[in-house]
C-alpha cells in the first residue's frame, strides 16, 4: 500500500452555530475524490467497505437505525438519502454530537463535505480550550486519508498493520502535525487569537504523535 501521495481534507472550516437554542461549534472538512457519487456513497455506507478503510461497524444501517463503530462512537442514523446525504448522532460515553455528510458531483469527481457539530457545554469547552478544532479535525483528516487510499486502490482494504506502522513513522507523524497546523489556520481564520490557536495546535499534535 502506497501512502506517499495520500492526503486528508482539502478545505477546513471552523464555525459557531445554535442547535435547539443551544450554542454549538462546527468543524467542517471537505475533499473532492476522483470517483462518482455511487462509488463514494458505497464506500461510506457499505459495512464491508467501511471496515476496509475506517473501522468495523455493526448495527442497523438505515434511517432510524442504530450503529456502533468498534472501539469508537455509536449513535442513530437520522437521515440516509442515497447517494446525497447522511446524518447521524455521534455518541461517545455521555457526550453526544452530530455529524452530517453531503456528496456533491463536481467536474473532477465527487466532493465529500463533512460537518461535526458539538455543544458548547462544560465538558466540551474544557476539551476545546485545550486542543481546539484539531482534536476532532485531525481524526477526520486521518479518515479522509484512509478513504482516499481505499478509493484510489479500487476499494482495496487498508491493511491495519501497515496503517499503524505508517502512523508511527516519521511520515505519519508529519501528516498529523501538518493536519493540526491546517486546523490551526482554519481556527485563526474564524477569529481565534493566533497565540491561543498555536498553543492548542501544539497540544493536539503532541497528543496524536504520542509525543505529549
Identify the residue ranges that each predicted region occupies.
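Long, contiguous C-terminal modules that act as interaction/assembly or targeting platforms
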Residues: 1-3, 7, 26, 32, ...
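Terminal "cap-and-tail" regions of soluble proteins that handle hydrophobic small molecules
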Residues: 1-21, 119-212
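Hydrophobic-ligand binding "helix-grip"
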Residues: 58-59, 65-113, 117-126, 205-212
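Short beta-edge strand/loop motif at the mouth of beta-sheet-based domains
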Residues: 21-22, 28-29, 35-39, 47-79, ...
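Hydrophobic pocket/interface hotspot
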Residues: 39-41, 50, 77, 86-88, ...
Amino acid at each position: 500500500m502506497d501512502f506517499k501521495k495520500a492526503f486528508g481534507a482539502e478545505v477546513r472550516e471552523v464555525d459557531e452555530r445554535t442547535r435547539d437554542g443551544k450554542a454549538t461549534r462546527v468543524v467542517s472538512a471537505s475533499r473532492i475524490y476522483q470517483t462518482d457519487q455511487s462509488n463514494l456513497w458505497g464506500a461510506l455506507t457499505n459495512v464491508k467497505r467501511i471496515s476496509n478503510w475506517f473501522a468495523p461497524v455493526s448495527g442497523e444501517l438505515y434511517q432510524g437505525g442504530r450503529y456502533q463503530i468498534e472501539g469508537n462512537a455509536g449513535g442513530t442514523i437520522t437521515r440516509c438519502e442515497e447517494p446525497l446525504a447522511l446524518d447521524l448522532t455521534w455518541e461517545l460515553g455521555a457526550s453526544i454530537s452530530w455529524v452530517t455528510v453531503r456528496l456533491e458531483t463536481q467536474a473532477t469527481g465527487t466532493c465529500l463535505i463533512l460537518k461535526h457539530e458539538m455543544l458548547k457545554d462544560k465538558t466540551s469547552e474544557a476539551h476545546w480550550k485545550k486542543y481546539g478544532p484539531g482534536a476532532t479535525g485531525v481524526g477526520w483528516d486521518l479518515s479522509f486519508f484512509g478513504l482516499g487510499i481505499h478509493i484510489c486502490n479500487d476499494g482495496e482494504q487498508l491493511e491495519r498493520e501497515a496503517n499503524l506502522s505508517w502512523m508511527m513513522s516519521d511520515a505519519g507523524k508529519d501528516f498529523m502535525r501538518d493536519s493540526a497546523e491546517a486546523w490551526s489556520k482554519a481556527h485563526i481564520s474564524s477569529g481565534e487569537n493566533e497565540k491561543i490557536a498555536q498553543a492548542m495546535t501544539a497540544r493536539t499534535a503532541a497528543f496524536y504523535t504520542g509525543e505529549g
